[in-house]
Amino acid sequence: MIGFLLLFFLTSSPAASTVVQCLGSQSMAKTVVMLLLAFALAGCTQLVTDVATVKDPGRYEVSLPGSGVTLGGILFRPASTLKLLPAIIVLHGWARPGVPGALRVEGTARLLSEQGYVALALSMRGWPPSSGWDDCGTQQPDDVAKAADWLATLPGVNADSIGVLGFSLGGQVALLSGSRSDRIKAIVAYFPITDVQRWKETTSNTGIRHFYVPLVCGNGYWNSPVHIAEQIHAPVLLIHGDRDTEVPTEQSLKMQEALRRADRHVELLIIGGGDHGFKGEQDEQAWSAATRFFNIYMKPGE
């Protein structure tokens, strides 16, 4: 908490100018911020920011505890408000090792922040700056549960209104996290993997079929949201393109069926002509549905 308040003081106006006056120079003020960042990289789990972020108010690079790992991400906070705000964790899809995961969904988190959400673009375990290894949804959902707990402690966050949005592998993890945390009140999953073994059999991606699933996912039964649908209590929106061959559309169709059998609330949006990713009007249609869904379940009465 102290770290957050200090960083807010250093990165806010007119507070920033006051710091400069006290320290004697802009460079000295930046040095203080860099020292805070270095402390964070040494293991601090409080809110931190770097010098580049000073030019982008409301954007913070963060480090937080996961389930036995340290997670990194980018947090966006809307302009100051007197009311508590809902928060959304944004999860990326699979990426080449070494690619910072949070950067892939930073733009999505920023857009959510502009709509009044505290938004955390999270690097899942296996992608920097988070530690650990990609595990195809084994412990990654526990990390998301820990991230939800962390968000709930931040000033200005409504601890009773936390959601998750994920893409592809991130969609799989978002769904699984709904069975690991009671804090999660809404889930939006873009073209998620929901049945790992069926995915292996039907994907057009030979790397997934011959390497990723056998080496990373294993049997994949408990990594498959379709098998634990009754444990997911949050409302779910599934979004999938009807021409997706990497994660075939049937993955969302089967998830919809499983959630309905479990008497859970689920909505499914099929994007005509959509592949494993959307463009132009497809993207607008999907985004409109996602934000509408979050607004209904996380901003009731507004």
Tell what function each PLM region has.
Residues 157-168:
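Alpha/beta-hydrolase fold nucleophile elbow
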Residues 171-182:
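Short glycine-enriched nucleophile-adjacent loop
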